[in-house]
Regions:
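Generic alpha-helical hydrophobic packing signal
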Residues: 15, 28, 109-111
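Short loop/helix-cap segments at secondary-structure boundaries that form the rim of catalytic
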Residues: 16-20, 37-38, 59-60
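Anionic-ligand binding patches
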Residues: 2-6, 40-154
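Short linear Ser/Thr-Pro motifs
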Residues: 9-11, 30, 97
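N-terminal beta1-alpha1 ligand-phosphate binding loop
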Residues: 1-23
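Short glycine-rich, Thr/Ser-proximal phosphate-binding strand/loop in the N-terminal lobe
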Residues: 24-39, 115-121
Length: 154
């Protein structure tokens, strides 16, 4: 039996990143309920989210290699996921303006028999952002499917 590589995400950015290494994979978005997940730190939270997404898809694809990921922005202990509205995106961007924060990405890989997960974190510093820049940016579709309302890759 040939196992497949499955990306447990509907994220266009995750698809793009994985495509840099291989085009031989399938995409199956997870139906994992993130709302009930809690943790004592943002890094632990994102690892649990990635693991939950990965295992939810792996349960439907035994024997395949499933990759699940999640990212959160940590601003002094406050977790920013994807903004829920224009005002939420503006609030996040104002908090990030001129400040340093952490970005945590959880990664989980499972083949059904073994599951491994880890977190990678980095510090990001924003230059100050004007209200006009925030208004222009939030008027686009860019911030609404990204943790912290921004994508560092552009």
């Amino acid at each position: 039996m040939n196992s497949k590589l499955i990306l447990a995400s509907g994220s266009p950015r995750r698809k793009e990143l994985l495509s840099l290494y291989t085009t031989d994979f399938e995409i199956h978005a997870s139906d994992f309920d993130e709302s009930a997940v809690t943790a004592d730190t943002p890094a632990r939270l994102v690892e649990k989210l990635a693991r939950g997404k990965c295992l939810a898809v792996a349960a439907r694809h035994p024997g395949d290699l499933v990759l699940g990921c999640d990212t959160v922005v940590d601003v002094n202990g406050e977790v920013f996921g994807k903004p829920h509205s224009v005002e939420d995106a503006k609030r996040m961007l104002r908090a990030l303006s001129g400040a340093t924060h952490q970005v945590h990405t959880g990664v989980c890989v499972s083949d059904g028999a073994q599951t491994k997960s880890f977190v990678d974190s980095c510090r990001v510093t924003f230059f100050p952002i004007s209200e006009e820049e925030i208004e222009r940016y939030t008027a686009t579709k860019e911030p609404y499917d990204k943790a912290g309302a921004y994508a560092i890759q552009g």
